[in-house]
């Protein structure tokens, strides 16, 4: 079961997989909804499962379970789950609301990339939150990477500009950019995200670029609604899903992929520096069901 062993699968414990009838399908659909796949995704998954079971004359419970896993894996395959780091530098902009774990996620990704031999620079463009740059600097020291920061209240665009200039001058492989936590319904803060993206496009036009939204798995379907607005503003390329170990509703990964057509790229499964892991659809689905 690997890294996803911490995902609770209690919603599926009561299902009798050997009795394949209408009651089974109804109970399975309810369980998928309770696990946070959402009503639409759950209904579609069960409908497809009915068709597969009928067409292949499946009778064994284990075979039904495997058929469902394959359906969910297909739903998760909406894009490359690996970061595009094909240029030097590559730019990764990390966004999200307050309290979801953006800065911590950046630090853990930096640690992972450093371990892969990458030269990493952290950009402290969260200049609104007190001590945000200090927190990022602690992570820079832990991961043994460089950081560009300014004073509290400085223009985030200026910090980003300086970071990109430093990255080009120093031969950095990856720039990880922290941003202020923002509510998806605050127009000014969302407009600032657009400004940061324009600076990246202007200063590093040929660079590989990622925009990763950090979501707290425990917020479930509410997080999904946030993500839809961020997608419109920021052009998301991937999701970092934190606190997946703290929820019984691990199915949110499937809902995100289906509703947003944006791949989950990393999942947080604990507090340790190595507990932010690249997402693997097969391992995830096997742990879930």
Per-range role (PLM):
Residues 39-41, 129, 245, 273:
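Short hydrophobic/aromatic residue motifs in ordered secondary structure
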Residues 180-182:
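Short glycine-rich anion-binding loops that position phosphate/pyrophosphate groups of nucleotides
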Residues 95-96, 178, 214, 268:
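Short beta-strand segments
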Residues 22, 43, 58, 62, ...:
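Non-catalytic, surface-exposed connector residues within folded enzymatic/regulatory domains
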Residues 156-170, 184-289:
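Conserved catalytic-core segment of NTP-binding enzymes
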Residues 4-125, 132-177:
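Primarily NTPase-proximal linker/entry elements flanking Walker-type ATP/GTP-binding cores
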Residues 125-128, 152, 218, 244:
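Structured loop/turn residues at secondary-structure junctions
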């Amino acid at each position: 079961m690997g890294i996803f062993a911490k995902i609770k699968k209690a919603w599926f414990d009561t299902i009798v997989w050997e009795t394949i009838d209408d009651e089974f399908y109804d109970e399975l659909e309810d369980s998928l909804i309770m696990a946070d796949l959402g009503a639409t995704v759950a209904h579609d998954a069960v409908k497809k499962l009915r068709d597969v079971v009928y067409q292949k004359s499946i009778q064994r419970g284990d075979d039904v379970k495997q058929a469902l896993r394959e359906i969910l894996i297909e739903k998760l395959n909406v894009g490359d789950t690996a970061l595009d780091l094909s240029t030097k530098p590559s730019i990764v902009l990390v966004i999200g609301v307050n309290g979801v774990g953006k800065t911590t996620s950046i630090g853990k990704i930096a640690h992972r990339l450093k371990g892969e031999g990458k030269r990493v620079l952290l950009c402290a463009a969260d200049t609104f939150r007190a001590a945000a740059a200090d927190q990022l600097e602690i992570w820079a020291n832990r991961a043994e990477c460089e950081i560009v920061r300014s004073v509290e209240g400085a223009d985030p665009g200026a910090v980003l500009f300086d970071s990109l200039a430093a990255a080009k001058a120093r031969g950095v492989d990856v720039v990880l950019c922290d941003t202020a936590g923002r509510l998806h319904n605050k127009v000014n803060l969302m407009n600032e995200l657009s400004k940061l993206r324009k600076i990246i496009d202007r200063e590093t036009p040929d660079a590989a670029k990622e925009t990763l939204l950090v979501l707290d798995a425990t917020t479930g379907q509410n997080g999904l609604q946030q993500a839809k607005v961020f997608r419109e503003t920021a052009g998301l390329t991937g999701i970092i899903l934190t606190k997946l170990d703290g929820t019984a509703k691990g199915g949110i990964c499937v809902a995100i992929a289906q509703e947003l057509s944006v791949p989950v790229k990393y999942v947080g499964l604990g507090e340790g520096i190595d507990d932010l892991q690249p997402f693997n659809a097969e391992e995830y689905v096997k742990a879930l069901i």
